[in-house]
Amino acid sequence: MGAKPGINLPIEHNNKIIGVVGITGEPNEVSPFGEVIKMTVEMMLQQEFLLKEIQLEKQTQENFIHDLISGRMGNDPDLFLTRGQIVGYDILIPRVALVMDIYQFEKTTKQSLQAFKGSKEGEIHLQRLKNDVLKTIQGIFVDTPQEIASYTGGDRFVVLKTINLKDSDEILRKKLFRMGKRIKDTISQQMKFKVTIGIGEYHEDIWGISKSFKEATQALDVGTKLEGAGDIYHVDNLGVGKLLAEIRGESQQEFMEKTIYSTKNNKEKKINETLLETLKAFFDNNLSISKTAQTIYVHRNTLLYRLRRVKEITGLDLKKFDDAVQLRMALKMRIYQGSNKFK
């Protein structure tokens, strides 16, 4: 049998022939269709190539940001500065870290993956959800391209906010809180997520960004444990919370056992829940009898009786500074260790 008439057209990409389109038929008749098919295939290849380039660029940018906040910069600062310039960031600009926890974001993404039964579409939906959050954040900084935003895993995102070193500490802090509130409100309104934010301090040199990130993470973790989610916490406002973060859990447990818990192996309380709540209200009202009584809606004499009971049970006298500090620390530790009763 003889060869059938037809045409073969080369498929080109980046000035290289990577394939051939073959169409059977009279050349004069099929040639126009061949050109259309050739053009369509080459356009599809170009789109796929550009998509991969964009994905690679995003991945390169994310890798750089993660190295920056984790302090993995290698032994050559100049090389790291060059990496930053390649992805569009001047990391010599002073910045402070804001770490955001988006309540149940990870749970939402897991549910999305399960809904798609682990298919490729589920992963695409997950990436789209992350990108939506980042676009919402980046939309706030549309006029300031040197602000850095990234997803860091779990429920968390980070913003590395540029700052003006001419600002006083007070002015800088107010600006950061205003920016944090704007981010929190925007995400809450547009995406219906509850957001908690931790803010770090400014530190010099390129390694200072990772220090600020760690502080912002600590502010977020400690603030959420002690005061609850949905607020903004600065590392310098943690008070004794910063100290608690440095004390081992076992040491905290031992301290509570000597003050408000009776035995080592369980949490049967020396003082009951009512007394603990009364004690917390007393501290929250700066040891004011009248304000505390008003806050918890009890008579002054009832409050005084409860405070005497605390002394009788624990052996600690709230009129003595050292004893009051011990009880205050024990209550803070109780909340920090996971009790949500007082939040």
Report the location of each language-model feature.
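Juxtadomain coupling helices with adjacent low-complexity linkers
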Residues: 25-83
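Generic detector of intrinsically disordered, low-complexity, polar/charged segments
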Residues: 3, 16-19, 195-197, 236
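A short beta-strand signature within small-molecule sensing/ligand-binding domains used
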Residues: 1-12, 19-22
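Short beta-strand-to-loop transition segments that serve as allosteric relay/switch motifs
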Residues: 19-28, 162-165, 200
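N-terminal functional module of multi-domain proteins
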Residues: 16-19, 25-30, 93, 144-146
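Cytosolic nucleotide-utilizing catalytic cores of signal-transduction proteins
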Residues: 79-97, 101-343
